[in-house]
Amino acid sequence: MGQFSLFGEVDRLARLSQLGDCLERLKIINWESFRPELQAATSKERKSKAGRPPYDVVMLFKVLVLQRLYNLSDDQTEYQINDRISFMRFLGLTLNDRVPDAKTIWLFRDTLTKAGAIERLFACFGEQLETQGLITHKGTIVDATFVDAPKQRNTRKENETIKNGEVPEEWSDHPHKLAQKDTDARWAKKNQETHYGYKDHAKVDADSKLITDYAVTSAEVHDSNEFENFLNEKDQVVYADSAYVGKTIPQGVENCVNEKGYKGKPLTEAQKESNRQKSKTRARIEHVFGFITGSMHGLTLRSIGINRARFNIGLTNLVYNMCRYSILKRKGPLTTG
């Protein structure tokens, strides 16, 4: 078998493009716009110029985007970059370049997490979407979805202690055991389904289906908890399901929250029809969560703790927006549909 030549690599990449390499759609992203925030979050003066130079921060950020797009572990990410020429092209790597190993990927993500960088990176991209007129603010949809975390095998007593905001005494005496325990995640039940982990509260632009804001909480927090924090003077109309009834809506914002029926006071036919009309728009946020669950291979966590959950869920929302942006730009002028 002959060696893989430069011409062979070029031919293979050309063929991948013909077959439809979905990662090429993300070339439209201005990756360099993230560099200032990435450098600020990772800036650390090198003690010596000896040894290998550090990896480029934008390339490492693109590794995290790849990882979230395909929902890969650190080890799987390292392997897939080495194995898949489409991944290498997306990262700007050749067969002769070093590939970040699993530990490097973990350390980079951990550094960004500790710096609280994901909120700024999300906002950075959001500003670009605003500037390009993709976020219209004509309609705003608010909803929340569960994000399951690795289930903990705790005793009932330990769970009660955690629920009270305390750490079981036995865990405090064993730091290694405590490091493997998630004291921030919570159990919750909805529609006969039980979940353990966190919630992604999202605010979505109705026209573009872009996420304009989000908040991360533990799973037991009510869906409507972040509602009032999301709304501002830019919003014209707000849509939400009946779980959000009774929440304060700023003056000037049209209330299109679905009405709720009560015992002894069911909804009238007119109210039911009104809810059906509102739901035609409100359902667009389900398309967002559906894309993440399907095209982005699931909305789950491998991490432990609220800080890592905030980073990973924030990254999920950012990567979704990148994918949605590439779709909108291919469609041309923005239309509702």
Residue ranges of model-derived segments:
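Charged, often Cys/His-bearing segments associated with DNA-binding zinc-finger transcription factors
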Residues: 1-34, 40, 328-337
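Arg/Lys-rich, glycine/proline-spaced intrinsically disordered segments
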Residues: 47-52, 260-269, 332, 337
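Polybasic low-complexity intrinsically disordered regions
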Residues: 79-82, 92, 100-251, 258
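Secondary-structure capping and boundary motifs in well-ordered enzyme cores
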Residues: 15, 51-59, 97-100, 277, ...
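C-terminal domain-tail junction helix/linker
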Residues: 157, 306-309, 315-317, 323, ...
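Basic, short loop/linker segments at the boundary and entry of helix-turn-helix/winged-helix-like folds
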Residues: 24-65, 69, 104
